[in-house]
Amino acid sequence: MTVYAIIGGTGLTQLEGLNIRQSLPMNTPYGAPSGEIQIGDYAGREVMFLARHGHPHRLPPHQVNYRANIWALKQAGAEAILAVNAVGGIHPAMGTGHFCVPHDLVDYTSGRQHTFFADDLEEVTHIDFSYPYSEALRVRLVAALAAEGCAFSDRGVYACTQGPRLETVAEIIRLERDGCDIVGMTGMPEAALARELELEYACLALVVNPAAGKSTAVITMAEIEQALRDGMGKVKATLARVLSAS
């Protein structure tokens, strides 16, 4: 049986309903992860949980130790990762409260520690990253969203920006021209690092605001926080359905 890990993003720093049996403080060659790895029972099976931004939420996207997080999950025994991400909507279909299970991504970040293949190498390794997300996991997420009656898109291109600021209107125009449908700040290098360690990885993205220029209103944290409160119940129900069906 596949060992699943859930990485919780903004709005999901705790997994309510997880019957925690163990909290592992992990040490890695890359420093400390965002927090302890919680291991317990959820939706009838064992699962790991890690809060990407820490609990409470304290780490901005550009300061998350992605290498330590992925390494720690691998060392704890994870085989597949379901990553939850809060995003802005670029494509007209991606309104607030809409879900997207992206099939591809574009990385616009800079300066992040983005690979395990950096130090004391005996040989250079080039991973195939043509399709960054596990299709098998994507299919399970899509089926779960449909069963939950959620509004969702079964495909989409995730633009990962540096953060922590939101994007300018001109930047969103550029991302849209590049073919991106949603925009977030934490999808990379997380997905690539998972691939380097041969972990299955997929993203469940919740749209919490229209991207810059996609609404006449100014984007506010109050708006984002309300969208997170409204959507987290569906996020947890979707994750539970994936796990119980796997």
UniProtKB/Swiss-Prot annotation:
One of its GO terms (biological process) is L-methionine salvage from methylthioadenosine. HAMAP family: MTAP (MF_01963). Phosphate binds at residues 10, 52-53, 186. Homotrimer. Substrate binds at residues 185, 209-211. CDD domains: MTAP_SsMTAPII_like_MTIP (cd09010). NCBIfam families: MTAP (TIGR01694), PRK09136.1 (NF006599). Belongs to the PNP/MTAP phosphorylase family. MTAP subfamily. GO terms for molecular function: S-methyl-5-thioadenosine phosphorylase activity. PANTHER family: S-METHYL-5'-THIOADENOSINE PHOSPHORYLASE. This is Probable S-methyl-5'-thioinosine phosphorylase. Gene3D superfamilies: Nucleoside phosphorylase domain (3.40.50.1580). GO terms for cellular component: cytosol. It catalyses: S-methyl-5'-thioinosine + phosphate = 5-(methylsulfanyl)-alpha-D-ribose 1-phosphate + hypoxanthine. It comes from Pseudomonas syringae pv. tomato (strain ATCC BAA-871 / DC3000). It holds the Pfam family PNP_UDP_1. Keywords: Glycosyltransferase, Purine salvage, Transferase. Although this enzyme belongs to the family of MTA phosphorylases based on sequence homology, it has been shown that conserved amino acid substitutions in the substrate binding pocket convert the substrate specificity of this enzyme from 6-aminopurines to 6-oxopurines. The keyword Glycosyltransferase applies. Its EC number is 2.4.2.44. The record marks 167, 221 as: Important for substrate specificity. Pathway: Purine metabolism; purine nucleoside salvage. Catalyzes the reversible phosphorylation of S-methyl-5'-thioinosine (MTI) to hypoxanthine and 5-methylthioribose-1-phosphate. Involved in the breakdown of S-methyl-5'-thioadenosine (MTA), a major by-product of polyamine biosynthesis. Catabolism of (MTA) occurs via deamination to MTI and phosphorolysis to hypoxanthine. InterPro entries: MTAP, Nucleoside_phosphorylase_d, Nucleoside_phosphorylase_sf, Purine_phosphorylase-2_CS. It is an enzyme of class 2 (transferase).
